Amino acid sequence: MSPITLDLTSDFNPANTTGAGSSSSQPRTLLVAPPSVASHEERISALFSTYPRDTTDLHMLDRLAAGLVTLPTSTYDLILVLTDPDGSRHAEASALLSNRAVWSLLVPALKAGGKLRSEDGTLGRDTTTPEAREAVLAGLVAGADGFTKPDYAEEEAVPLRFGLKRKTNPNPVVAPIQPVAQVVTAAPAGVGFVTLDLNDDLDLDGEDDDDDVIDEDTLLTEADLRRPIQQPPECQPKPGKKRRACKDCTCGLAERLEAEDKARRDKADQALNTLKLKSEDLLELDLTVPGKTGSCGSCALGDAFRCAGCPYLGLPPFKVGEEVSILNNVPQL
């Protein structure tokens, strides 16, 4: 049985990213590969023969998905997903790229204007795949050869100067004003005044013709006049209540109720007038004349003929010529 050797070194080697042979002007490349690529050393050796080791980094997709790797920000010009040129590992890479945590690490590490593509060239062609949707949601733009990170210009604060503190010249030089000859043009006849005839439209002379006014009654036929008036449901009185007209009554109920109230008031006034007594209808009590009685017909005849509420109840009959006055409902003889 052959011995098993474990490689415990980190995949991210800082010496490779900041080596003596690297330069900030040289484009940097990040290779991301599915886990199955790690078992093929010849495959990795062939990749580093194409991409220089001093400007290229290699990471595994499963370690990116697990959050075990930290990538520098805005460093790589190209991120290449290894799937083999024949696409034999495309399904494995697509499954890992469907994880949003992978894109949250790859997109910040990509420079503005940098590209992210797959080795077989199929990544980004179909924008309906799960990995394409995650790339677009992360901020990349799909293209024919993969995805591109937009180059957004950095925000800059620009001060606004409104010219409030402008320096003024204490002795400004004023250019002489050249006199301009005034050109006088004669107005043509009929121009320059307006004559208004207000009598044509406003009819201020008081003569108003009703030629354009249509009488509404002429629009009704005999059948319309004989037709009974349809009472609206809202005008119908509720049980136990008096029928009342609406505020904007148009069915004639308000006029009819007003006429009924007026007739009722006239009848009540007529009945009230019949109960009023005139001066000649009043009977004056004159005790100086023998045989005269009060309005009740028995006040001067004695106690037996006085009313129940008479203040002189219990007193003897009045004498002829006797003056009688009442003060506070008390007889004063």
Swiss-Prot record:
Disulphide bridges, residue numbers: none
Region (N-terminal SAM-like domain) residue spans: 23-158
Region (Fe-S binding site B): 296-310
Chief place of localization: cytoplasm
Binding site for [2Fe-2S] cluster: C235, C246, C249, C251
Top-level lineage group: Eukaryota
Any single Gene Ontology cellular-component annotation: mitochondrial intermembrane space
Listed GO MF terms: 2 iron, 2 sulfur cluster binding; 4 iron, 4 sulfur cluster binding; electron transfer activity; metal ion binding
Residue numbers binding [4Fe-4S] cluster: C296, C299, C307, C310
Required cofactor(s): [2Fe-2S] cluster; [4Fe-4S] cluster
GO biological process per UniProt: iron-sulfur cluster assembly
Region feature (Fe-S binding site A): 235-251
Motif (Cx2C motif 1): 296-299
Keywords: 2Fe-2S, 4Fe-4S, Cytoplasm, Iron, Iron-sulfur, Metal-binding, Mitochondrion
Subcellular location: Cytoplasm; Mitochondrion intermembrane space
Region (Disordered): 1-29
Residue positions of motif Cx2C motif 2: 307-310
Subunit annotation: Monomer. Interacts with tah18. Interacts with mia40.
Task of the protein: Component of the cytosolic iron-sulfur (Fe-S) protein assembly (CIA) machinery required for the maturation of extramitochondrial Fe-S proteins. Part of an electron transfer chain functioning in an early step of cytosolic Fe-S biogenesis, facilitating the de novo assembly of a [4Fe-4S] cluster on the scaffold complex cfd1-nbp35. Electrons are transferred to dre2 from NADPH via the FAD- and FMN-containing protein tah18.
Similarity section: Belongs to the anamorsin family.
Protein name per its UniProtKB record: Fe-S cluster assembly protein dre2
Gene coding for it: dre2
